[in-house]
Each structure stands twice: as C-alpha cells, then as structure tokens.
Amino acid sequence: MFSEPVKRIYDSQGAYYFQSSEAIRRLEGAIVKYTDLVESRDVADLELSGVVGGVVKVLDRLDQLVSETPPIPGPRRYGNMACRDWHEKIEREIPGLLEDLISSHFPSELQCVVELRYYLANSFGSATRLDFGTGHELSFLATVAALDMLGASFDGDQVLYIFDRYYSLVHRLILSYTLEPAGSHGVWGLDDHFHLAYILGSSQWCNRKKLAMEPNDLSDPVLVEQYSRTNIFCKTLNFVFTVKSGAFREHSPMLFDISRSVRTWAKVRKGLWKMYKDEVLNKFPVIQHFWFGTGFYPWVDYKNGKPLPNYENSPDIDETNDLKTQAQANMDGTRVVESRFLSPGNETFVRRPQLPQDSGVGTMRSSTPESRLMNVTTRSTRSTAGPGQGRMGPPTSMGIVQTRMPSSTTSQAHASRLMNTPRQ
C-alpha cells in the first residue's frame, strides 16, 4: 500500500485539486489535533522512551551531522555549500534511522519507510536552493502525523517536545549554513521561515487560568527570551530577534501588528490558522514541493476516494504560478498548449485549451475561508462553484485522464487514528 512519493502539483490547477485531496484533509486534521493537544501546556522535559524517544534519537543524529559538517570558511551571500554535504549525509542515513525506529515500534509497517523517508528528508530545507521555508516545516508535520497514523498516539507534551527539538535543529541549520528564506514575502510576510510554529505556540497560551504573557507583550524581547524555553511562539520570535536588527515594527510588521491589535491568544491562533490555510496550504509555490504516495498522503478525492486528475505540463511550456498570466498573453484570450497526462504504465500526449483570462483561476485563495472550519469533519463545506462563480471555481474542461490507484483500506484505517484520537 505504500509507494515512493511522486510529484502531482505542477501548476495552480494542481494546487486547486489539492484542496479536494485526502492528503490535505489529513494535514489539516493533524494541525487541528495538535493545536488542541498542546493548548495551555508548556514545553517540558520528558523521560524519552517509545516512539518519542526514537524520533528524538533521529533528530539528535541529524544534529550531530551538523557538527561533523562545519560551514565552509569565507563570505557567502546565498547559503553555505557545506549544507549540500550535510544533505547528502542525511539522505544516506535517514533510511536506516527510520528502519530502526519503525522496526522497533511498528514492525508490521516497515514498508512505510519508503514514504516516511521522503517527508523527513524534506523537512530541513532545500539542498539545491540552500533555503528553508514553510513547505519544509509542512513536511515535518507530515512526518509526525504519519507516525501518529501508524499508532504513535502522541499526547500534548510529546508533540511539544518533538516540535521544540525540531525547531532547535532547524535554527541551527539556518545559522550554520546561512539558509535563505524560501518564497518569503519579505517584511510583509509573517516570518521568513516559519508559520506552524506560531500556531502551536499561540495555542500553548490559550485557556490558561493564570496567563504569564499577553499578545501585547510580544514586543518585549526580554520577556520573549524568558519564555522561549517553554513556548514555541516565543522560541520562534526570539530567533527572529536574534537574526534581525532594527525596530520590531520595521523588520516584522505583521508580528508587530499582532502584538498591538489582537487582544487574546485565541484570536491570534484563529487568525494564524486562517492565514496558514491561505498562504501555505493554498499556495502553489509552497505546496508544489509536497509529493504524494499511496499510503499516508494519497492523491485521491477525500469525498469518494477516487484518484484526482493528474497531468504534467510539457517541458517546453513556460510554467508560471498563475494561469491567468498565460491567458493574458493571447490576443483572443485562449490558446492550446500541450500537456502530458500520466497514468500507471501509460503516458499519452493530449491537447488541452489554455484557460481563458476570466476563468477565475489565479492565485489560489478560497472565496469563503470562513467556511473552512478547523474541524476536519466539515470539509464538505468547500466551495464547488463552477467557472465564473468565484475564484475557487474548477478550471474549464480539459479531457483529463482519470488514473486508477490501488485500494487504500489500510490507509484509511491509519487516517482514522489521526482524526479520531480524543484529546489527551
């Protein structure tokens, strides 16, 4: 049931189909579950054992490899080339590390390593671009959620410990190898590298009987540093204060605005979650690097389990992030481009019409983000409007070849562990 993950998202059409996938349902379900589990908790020392101990052992080994791979001396503007050596080392070691972890705790699921190794290896930035961003952070979430689907059943303290250890390692990677932001919006983005960390950290402050820190205290670097050891929001913001100079309002205006305009942590969490769905899960530049297997994150419709449309643009096509841009290049508003539709064991070339300028498919923002509730059981509320009925309308008919995929009954059983685990 497990298979080598493959690329399915090649343009914003693929990003549109991703919104209907079982994969995004599981990822969103994991975020909702973990934000609930960590609510009102601090990062605390744990007696490491079981799956948690195994995960931390893997992260410790990857951290040790950083020590064994020092940065190359000399000024570097776009990342240190030693990072590529580090990535080569982890590519060699991760399969064995995961086999030890899975064989110790889930021996009957050893075949899952073929998928799990992809998500873990992609959790630490790009060896090609020497950068790190929210897509890599998403890959680590996918790794943790995959272990949860196998039966790890993490509680809130364990979730916090694992993510805190992960962020410590990533902070070291960014500083050691001067990793660039991946797809950053600059000062107009939430953060150069992270987003999920702020959701988890804000949830830690929610519903406390005695609140040690209010949102308006975020502009106090001394207080932020004080709580950076127990709160992931403060840990991440303290990292920002470490790597950036100047006024808070100038280098991180969005975080500064949160500290000035949002009064409660519950509202901070709600706003960050809504923003995450729009700016991470719904953005082609981010999710194009998320690949799909047949076990943990299958490329199938979450409603009926059928395979989603699957195609790849020809290499000679000038790919853009926005199909509307391509349409505007044509005098009549349409043109025909060549796409390769893929199915197992069969590749055919098909002519399809390019989307017209008014097709409504542009940057992939939901027309009704409020309807995308934080409960994964309500995913049927997603917009199914047709062309011209909102920005999330499906693209015009393209004669897409529907491919058949193997049944994933076991995969659904794994997913049910993730979705239905009660709050600890």
Curated annotation (Swiss-Prot):
It comes from Candida glabrata (strain ATCC 2001 / BCRC 20586 / JCM 3761 / NBRC 0622 / NRRL Y-65 / CBS 138) (Yeast). One of its GO terms (molecular function) is protein tyrosine phosphatase activator activity. This is Serine/threonine-protein phosphatase 2A activator 1. It is found in: Cytoplasm; Nucleus. One of its GO terms (biological process) is G1/S transition of mitotic cell cycle. Gene3D superfamilies: 1.20.120.1150. Residues 348-424 are annotated as: Disordered. InterPro entries: Phstyr_phstse_ac, PTPA_C_lid, PTPA_sf.
